[in-house]
Amino acid sequence: MSGEDGPAAGPGAAAAAARERRREQLRQWGARAGAEPGPGERRARTVRFERAAEFLAACAGGDLDEARLMLRAADPGPGAELDPAAPPPARAVLDSTNADGISALHQACIDENLEVVRFLVEQGATVNQADNEGWTPLHVAASCGYLDIARYLLSHGANIAAVNSDGDLPLDLAESDAMEGLLKAEIARRGVDVEAAKRAEEELLLHDTRCWLNGGAMPEARHPRTGASALHVAAAKGYIEVMRLLLQAGYDPELRDGDGWTPLHAAAHWGVEDACRLLAEHGGGMDSLTHAGQRPCDLADEEVLSLLEELARKQEDLRNQKEASQSRGQEPQAPSSSKHRRSSVCRLSSREKISLQDLSKERRPGGAGGPPIQDEDEGEEGPTEPPPAEPRTLNGVSSPPHPSPKSPVQLEEAPFSRRFGLLKTGSSGALGPPERRTAEGAPGAGLQRSASSSWLEGTSTQAKELRLARITPTPSPKLPEPSVLSEVTKPPPCLENSSPPSRIPEPESPAKPNVPTASTAPPADSRDRRRSYQMPVRDEESESQRKARSRLMRQSRRSTQGVTLTDLKEAEKAAGKAPESEKPAQSLDPSRRPRVPGVENSDSPAQRAEAPDGQGPGPQAAREHRKVGKEWRGPAEGEEAEPADRSQESSTLEGGPSARRQRWQRDLNPEPEPESEEPDGGFRTLYAELRRENERLREALTETTLRLAQLKVELERATQRQERFAERPALLELERFERRALERKAAELEEELKALSDLRADNQRLKDENAALIRVISKLSK
């Protein structure tokens, strides 16, 4: 029995021992946990707002006790050290605002809570504190019509002249007559100038800006919260004079505030048109983006949206013009050895430009190597001139070198030599070889044919040698050859045997009074048969003087063309003839191409005596003279055919009087010269055509405008008729509906009338029955 109990008691004792050990461990752990300090009780989490938000919430809820506790808690006490620059903590709590700048006093006025208003004012709140839009508590009370709050604020020093951001006083926001009367009475009592109060901010800004300009420094004054500059404020409120001063002082029109707004954004948002124009003129960007990616057009008021679009187009046009001018200014200029500035741009036709280009190409290889050419007057007295410079080029067109304005010019000897540099250079630059240039000053100098259809006579061998570069002169043993200048057409000298050259008089033709030429330059002097190719001297005159001189030259060039009496006398002196035979020159023809009628008179006996043998003056001689002159002028258009014409002319001249008479008889009716050879006349004709075309277009535009107005009126009438026609079915339907309603109403009234007659009959029957009953009752009562 004892043996069986032993094994059974062993497992039970082991389990008990294990439990005892576990119990001991728990006891020891509890002892250690009790000895160590515990974490304590966990505090509940709370949400704390800013003191300003809590104070605003307490005042909005009317909890004045809580507001007093907050103000008392904000007071640091008598011994605390305070920052002198910062407001007291209690005052900061009283004037605390929300995101819109609304303080507790603003909110109390909005809620019409006079008790909270009194509490805040008694505690020291700022009565004239403005929100983000510039509204004071008095603005709020006036706008809401709270008379009691307005009186209380006025009695405690509220500013009745305060102006908000829109430029409004509390009086401007008054809604009721009682409020308006209260504010007007207060304004009269205080003597406030309403207009001056509205201009006070602008005057202050203007004064500060002038002080900045006088001081020479422009401070970067910015709003501490919004970052707006003075230009932002002036643009938003339309202070144009302040903006002009700021922009003239160098204020950047692209300044940005805290939101990335430029002054143009502000002006567009508030709809200030003048400010938008001024900023756009000073480079305000129409495509400037804010931090939100908005342009001025995106923020603009509807009234200024069209203006901004127009300003954007103008800025784009100005930008394109500036880029085009810069690109033109960067084009390479053709090199020129002459540094003299051109006084004006040559007005040449396309044909003349091509001839000038060809001439400049032919002149370049040997133009600078040959000896210089002098004028006849200068060749006798003055020294050798320096070699000519290369002609200046403008857009690929060679232009003649400009003579120096400082060179001495004698008006008595050469009346038109002052303007000789204005002659067009067609072929006069291509000179013959040096050995062909003979001594100047030969006797017998005559008049040459100038650019204005004047007659000049050739007198020396030098005049014969001045020809186009491709012309080979045909020597004539008897007759001098006519000189050919640059596209200047002239007739050959008079046909004579041994006498000095004389001029064949030309009768005045009624169909063609003026012989057209290919040049518009003034006539050359009788002695200046060739151009002076001297080196131009640099002109030191100013730009304005140069332009004025060029204008005078152009005017004189138009008004002094023709041959005067002085030219004729000098030509006669040079030819050795007496001036007694010449008649006084008549007044110039008032046409575009002037001429001297006295010179063309062919009835003079002196001129008839001067004519060579067998060649008396008459219509045939004049026509032959013009024909020969036209043949001489013909090769000026194409230089290839000139040698053959020259040789043919020489053979004709050498044939004697009979050949000349046959030629005259064959060419009695020469073809008129085309007026297209005369650039000046062509310009005049073109101008007249353009003017007529403009008049025609203007009349057409006027007619079109009137027609458009008539069509608009007709369209409006048609639209009105269509609207009436469109509304007519609706009107008919409405009338039909009303008719049916009236019919129904009439039927109802008829039914009512029938019922009324029945009711009357019933009523009468009841009356009769009632009378019968009354009689029965009266009988029964007896």
UniProtKB/Swiss-Prot annotation:
Region spans: Disordered: 1-43, 316-686
Residues that bear Phosphoserine: 399, 407, 427, 452, 509, 604, 647
Location in or out of the cell: Cytoplasm; Cytoplasm, Cytoskeleton, Stress fiber
Gene Ontology cellular component terms for the protein in this record: cytoplasm; stress fiber
Biased composition (Acidic residues): 374-383, 670-680
Entry protein name: Protein phosphatase 1 regulatory subunit 12C
Keywords for this protein: Acetylation, ANK repeat, Coiled coil, Cytoplasm, Cytoskeleton, Phosphoprotein, Repeat
Organism of this sequence: Homo sapiens
InterPro entries the record matches: Ankyrin_rpt, Ankyrin_rpt-contain_sf, MYPT1/MYPT2/Mbs85, PP1_Regulatory_Subunit, PRKG1_interact
Location of Phosphothreonine modifications: 560
Annotated GO biological process: neuron projection morphogenesis; signal transduction
Composition bias, Basic residues: 547-557
Source domain of life: Eukaryota
Annotated signal sequence range: none
Keyword Ribonucleoprotein: no
Basic and acidic residues bias spans: 349-365, 537-546, 567-583
Record's compositionally biased regions (Low complexity): 1-17
Stretches of the chain forming a coiled coil according to its record: 297-329, 681-782
Modification after translation: Phosphorylation at Thr-560 is essential for its interaction with PPP1CB.
